[in-house]
């Protein structure tokens, strides 16, 4: 399984390297669309694992200090949020690239902690120093997410 995962990750790495990235008209990230897709996704099995890589916090002044230029100071209207991801048992690995995301990741951590009694999920914040670190982190943590989900399945088996 690790060889298949490594091959898939290497293919995705090539695809990511070919993406041309452009900016919006503010510094804050519009993460709501990604969270909404994760919540709506038809997961094939009980292992639900999402990776967030961002160099800026989510829209909304509560997720960062007021120094950032922000088009949505109240947050993105009518958006799914991180709480729905935690409630659905979607594990989240946050890749920290800059300290600008500290406030946001602390809020996410507190939200996930509220749901750990209901459903065990994996929430981690990991700083990386080079793009090569990302592949190893994904392999290691996707295995952890699978183990967490298996624990949930075993816990919920009828006795």
Where are these predicted regions, by residue range?
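Divalent cation-coordinating acidic motifs and surrounding scaffolds
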Residues: 1-159
């Amino acid at each position: 399984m690790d060889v298949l995962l490594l091959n898939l990750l290497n293919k995705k790495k090539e695809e990511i390297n070919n993406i041309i990235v452009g900016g919006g008209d503010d510094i804050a990230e519009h993460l709501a669309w990604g969270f909404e897709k994760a919540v709506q996704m038809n997961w094939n099995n009980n292992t639900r694992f999402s990776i967030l890589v961002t160099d800026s916090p989510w829209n909304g002044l509560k997720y960062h200090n007021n120094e950032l230029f922000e088009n949505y100071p109240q947050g993105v209207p009518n958006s799914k949020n991180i709480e729905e991801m935690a409630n659905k048992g979607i594990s989240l690995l946050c890749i920290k690239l800059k300290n600008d995301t500290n406030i946001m990741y602390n809020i996410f951590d507190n939200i996930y902690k509220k749901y750990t009694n209901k459903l065990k999920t994996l929430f981690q914040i990991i700083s990386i120093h080079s793009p090569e670190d990302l592949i190893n982190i994904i392999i290691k943590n996707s295995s952890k997410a699978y183990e967490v989900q298996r624990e949930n399945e075993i816990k919920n088996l009828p006795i």
